[in-house]
Amino acid sequence: LPPQIRKVAVVVSPSALQIKEIQENGFDIVQIHGQVLPEALETLQIPFLRAFNVDNMQEWERYEAEPKCIGYVFDAVKPGSGETFDWSSIPNLPEDGKPYLLAGGLNPANVGNAIEAMHPDGVDVSSGVERDLEPGKDPEKIEAFVKIVRKA
């Protein structure tokens, strides 16, 4: 990959050993879902994005002062399920100047409304651009998604 493309490892409740392996394998950022164990945070030498499920957001304040935390990802209750959530259900967005991404069931049909409602700094998509009948991503859905994001 060209050096300007940042490589992000997406993990759930990583151990210190997993963090070490991620760093040794050339990732630039870690996106952490689940628990952030103290020993993993101590091992972390690259920046991370802290992901929160919308039903469990009471922790984000502890990351405001964490210098390694460069932003947040707000995701649905069941990440990776393709299910969206009520974007107005996020009561207080962080006001610490760190960017936040919106995730959770985004697809070409709803991403424009999501951006309009939440004004995120970016969006995160996976299942919303999957092929309908076979595994993998659908290039046409990706193109439609990107076009809508750029217009929003």
Question: PLM features: residue spans?
Answer:
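Low-complexity, intrinsically disordered short peptide segments enriched in small/polar/basic residues
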Residues: 70, 139, 143-146
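Structural alpha-beta junctions
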Residues: 46, 150-152
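C-terminal active-site rim and adjoining tail of enzyme catalytic domains
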Residues: 103-110, 115-129, 143-150
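Conserved anion-binding
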Residues: 2-110, 130
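Glycine-rich phosphate-binding active-site loops on the catalytic face of alpha/beta enzymes
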Residues: 32-37, 77-79, 117-142
